[in-house]
Structure formats: structure tokens, C-alpha cells
Amino acid sequence: MQIDFNSDMGESFGAWTIGDGVDTELMAFISSANIATGFHAGDPSTMRRTIEQAKRLGVAIGAHPGFRDLVGFGRRHINAPAQELVDDMLYQLGALRELARVQGVPLQHFKPHGALYMHLARDEEAARLLVENLQRLEPDLLLYCMPGSVICNVAQELGQPVVREFYADRAYDLSGSIVFTRNVRAHDPAEVAARVIRACQQGLVRTVEGDDLAIQFDSICLHSDTPGALALAQATRQALDGAGIEVRTPR
């Protein structure tokens, strides 16, 4: 069995660092990095350094655009027209793509951040407009999304390749949606690792309602801003390796 392991990277801004500031150490355990592109976190120099590090470690990179919300770290919903949101996302994609192009690193994927990710999971107008633009711009760019979400369905309809995600450090409800929160709590590394292995081997995750939910996915996501993220990533990777599950990029 093979699985992708992704995490959000480069979510610092100038002298400010999000979470435990463990990007450098955590990147050794993953196969794909979602690099913040300046609107919810990140700045040009941080983006450049994160690309350099990913290149050294052989980690694939993707754009991680968010709402224009530095203060709220992109976790606050912004009620903007679909065209404005797509303009902002393409602007952020272009910024990362050029910084990566200088270093000869191709972009593997595109993954919206936080509240924008959840918005596109539900809003068909914005999701369809984004995918239509990606089809014109980069029809082979992988789109990371929640399985069964609006944007996942639209992308599959229009032919944009998708990578369905499983969230190692977020709770699920019976609808199959992650339970979005602005107050991220710490997790026990052994419990997270066991949850991931169960999802990989059995295709099941326990929901907040206490029932099992069947889930299909291509990539495991673990957030670098979760308290204790490095220990979570290390425990998860060790569990995957121990179970004979190969961690590699989706293509």
C-alpha cells in the first residue's frame, strides 16, 4: 500500500512563527508540503526558504492559498464574491510558482487553507470557477480536497485530478466533514498514529458522534501548527513504516 503524507509549511510571517516552529524537522517525515502563499501566513522570503528545504529533502510542493486574513490565520470566513476569491487564489498560486520556478522546482498541487478550504467544500459557484481557471492554467495540477465535497465533485466532473485527504489531527462528523475549529488542541501521538493506521487498513474513522465512518483517501494531512506537531508526525510516520505502508507522493 502507498499513501501520500502532507503538511502545511511556511506559515510564518517575518519575525512571527506559527505553532511550534518545527517546519525544518517535520518536513523530514512527509512527502508533500503545502506552502503558505502570503494571505493567511507566509511572506516571499519564507516561501523561498521553504521551497529550498523541500528541494533538498525531495519533498513535493504545492500552493496553500488562504483568505486575506493574516490576523485570523485564515480561519475566519470572508464573505466575498466567487470571482474575487478566485482572483486572490490565482494571485497566490502565481507568487509561489515563480519563486519555485527560479529554483527549478515544479508545483505538484494546489490546496486551499482553513476557512477557504471549507468554503470551497460547500460553495459550488466558487469551487466551479476555481476549477475552470485551473483547467485553463494547469490542467494537470493536483487539487487536494475533502472526499465527497463540492469542490471534489466539481473537479472530477471537469477533469482536474484530485487528491482526497484524511485529516490525522482533526475530528470528523457523520456527514464526512471535518469539525472546523479555531482552537486547535494537543493530541496523543500514539492515538493519532493508531487512528491513521486504522483509516489506511480498514477505511474507517471514529466520528465525534461515536460511530464509525467509512472513508476513502489518497493523502494523510497533519497540520504543522497543531501543538506537538513534530511528535505527531514522527509517530505517524513510524507507524506507517512499521505497517508496511509506503509514504510517497501521489504521482
From Swiss-Prot:
The keyword Hydrolase applies. It comes from the Bacteria. GO terms for biological process: carbohydrate metabolic process. Catalyzes the cleavage of 5-oxoproline to form L-glutamate coupled to the hydrolysis of ATP to ADP and inorganic phosphate. Its EC number is 3.5.2.9. Forms a complex composed of PxpA, PxpB and PxpC. The lineage of its organism: Bacteria, Pseudomonadati, Pseudomonadota, Gammaproteobacteria, Pseudomonadales. This is 5-oxoprolinase subunit A 2. Belongs to the LamB/PxpA family. GO terms for molecular function: 5-oxoprolinase (ATP-hydrolyzing) activity; ATP binding. The keyword Transferase does not apply. The gene is pxpA2. It is an enzyme of class 3 (hydrolase). Transmembrane segments: none annotated. It catalyses: 5-oxo-L-proline + ATP + 2 H2O = L-glutamate + ADP + phosphate + H(+). Keywords: ATP-binding, Hydrolase, Nucleotide-binding.
